[in-house]
């Protein structure tokens, strides 16, 4: 988010204004280098106050934006899922629950039911597993008409199995599964 980037720059002693950073973000979008998705909410004020999540237009651009120098496969997988959702012509937003948990995507295409999508590289770390599942569960309780879906890079089902009504699918199978309905 712009706020995080602003805080990072300020902590490094680099003077910059938030308006300038928002303008630069707009330039990057105009140049088709990044895309942003907004918070799903009925309140325009809430949407404006909460930062948009930014993603590169192509997972291959992630090393350019990644400052640690390490590969970020989780972010690459999220970006690939977002690109596919947009290719499918779905409206995409992210969800923040009342508890403060975030779900990566809410994909909507009326009259179909919305789909809550949480993307996770793998669930082998118990802390990661708990965080990802708890966020998806909380969002599915707040949006009972939405199908909660967890996508992972792993091709083996998570153990122990996910609680109802959460569904799991390997990301590769999901990416290849669109029927255009």
Please name every model-derived segment.
Residues 103, 125-128, 157-161:
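Short active-site-adjacent structural elements
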Residues 108, 114-124:
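Active-site ExK catalytic segment of metal-dependent nucleases
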Residues 122, 129-144:
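Short, charged, amphipathic alpha-helix that recurs within catalytic cores of restriction-modification
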Residues 144-153:
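Short, hydrophobic beta-strand segments that form beta-sheet elements in well-ordered domains
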């Amino acid at each position: 988010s712009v706020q995080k980037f602003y805080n990072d720059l300020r902590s490094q002693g680099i003077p910059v204004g938030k308006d300038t950073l928002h303008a630069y973000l707009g330039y990057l979008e105009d140049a088709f280098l990044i895309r942003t998705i907004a918070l799903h909410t009925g309140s325009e004020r809430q949407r404006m106050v909460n930062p948009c999540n930014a993603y590169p237009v192509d997972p291959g651009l992630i090393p350019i934006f990644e400052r640690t120098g390490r590969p970020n496969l989780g972010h690459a997988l999220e970006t690939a899922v977002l690109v596919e959702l947009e290719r499918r012509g779905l409206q995409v937003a992210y969800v923040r629950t009342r508890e403060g948990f975030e779900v990566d995507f809410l994909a909507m295409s009326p009259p179909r039911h919305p789909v809550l999508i949480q993307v996770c590289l793998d669930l082998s770390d118990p802390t990661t597993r708990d965080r990802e599942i708890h966020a998806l569960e909380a969002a599915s309780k707040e949006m009972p008409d939405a199908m909660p879906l967890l996508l992972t890079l792993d091709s083996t089902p998570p153990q122990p199995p996910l609680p109802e009504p959460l569904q799991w699918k390997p990301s590769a199978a999901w990416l290849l599964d669109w029927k255009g309905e």
